Design a protein with these regions (language model features):
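N-terminal auxiliary segments of SAM/dcSAM-dependent transferases
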Residues: 1-22
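C-terminal alpha-helical "lid/dimerization" subdomain adjacent to the S-adenosyl-L-methionine
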Residues: 18-19, 89, 162-217, 221, ...
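Conserved alpha-helix/loop element of class I SAM-dependent methyltransferases that forms part
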Residues: 30-33, 39-60, 75
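Hydrophobic beta-strand segment of the Class I
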Residues: 31, 130-131
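Class I SAM-dependent methyltransferase SAM/SAH-binding core
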Residues: 61-119
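A short acidic, Gly/Pro-enriched loop at the edge of an enzyme's catalytic core
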Residues: 118-129
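A short glycine-rich, Lys/Arg-flanked "PGG" loop and its adjoining helix->strand segment in the class I
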Residues: 143-155
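C-terminal lobe and adjacent flexible extensions of AdoMet/dcAdoMet transferase-like proteins
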Residues: 219-243
Length: 243
């Protein structure tokens, strides 16, 4: 069966990339509150665990793809880099992120930049490390985005990808299924005023090639020493690979 593309608004005249940018622009003002509220704050723990995967390599510069408002970029400061780039296609999310960087007095290190993950505006072999938090399932062309990520990494550089997955074990599978299908869309709609944005979340998670399937895609593209770590009973997975 052909793979069905999951888009936030399912508009025939717009690409997935356009709809994703529009969606995040629409919810940018309430995104941080909703993100931490709906994840019960666990997303912060996941990011810290993901960043710890990069402690095995020297990190002078790092790019956070699909950075949103920059939470992962801020978490990357634990690695003491000299330069952090936060790249995103949503101008609305970046505007919120820029104010966050100024408020936290880290705007001299973290640069928020408008850009496309499938056409990263940096030279090949430029970054020591790369992170993506809950962003790869939003790529219009998953393999192209992953290929671009590999291109901008230096030889020996490391990519760490944090993404939602589907728990397999009782009772986490049942609890997460109910939570993602009903609780998140209900509160997301009322707080963000965008009904589709938080219905898109469980739909995009369900369609994403997780686990071994995603590892095979990474291997096919050219990532090496690929590892995956389940967190919180499989609600999310941390993938890591070397160039």
């Amino acid at each position: 069966m052909p793979k069905i593309e999951v888009k936030p608004y399912n508009q025939d005249d717009k690409s997935k990339k356009q709809e994703v940018a529009e969606m995040f622009d629409n919810i940018s003002a309430r995104y941080d509150f909703l993100n931490h509220f709906l994840s019960l704050g666990i997303d912060k723990i996941w990011r810290r665990k993901a960043i710890n995967q990069l402690r095995s390599i020297p990190v002078i510069n790092i790019i956070d793809i699909a950075t949103g408002t920059g939470d992962f970029a801020i978490a990357a400061l634990k690695l003491n880099p000299e330069e952090v780039i936060g790249l995103d296609i949503s101008a609305g999310m970046l505007a919120v992120g820029e104010q966050k960087m100024i408020k936290n007095k880290v705007d001299s290190i973290i640069k928020m930049q408008l850009g496309d993950s499938e056409n990263i505006p940096y030279d090949s072999n430029y970054f020591d490390a790369l992170t993506v938090g809950f962003g790869v399932r939003n790529f219009e062309n998953l393999e192209l985005g992953l290929t671009e990520m590999l291109r901008v990494l230096k030889p020996g550089g490391k990519a760490v990808i944090l993404e939602f997955s589907k728990p397999k074990r009782f009772p986490i599978k049942q609890i997460f299924g109910f939570y993602s299908r009903y609780f998140i869309p209900f509160f997301g709609k009322r707080i963000s005023k965008d009904a589709q944005a938080y219905s898109y979340l469980p739909e995009s998670v369900a369609a994403f090639p997780e686990g071994k399937d995603f590892e095979e895609i990474l291997h096919k593209i050219g990532y090496k020493n690929i590892e995956s770590t389940l967190v919180s009973g499989g609600i999310a997975t941390i993938y890591a690979g070397i160039k």
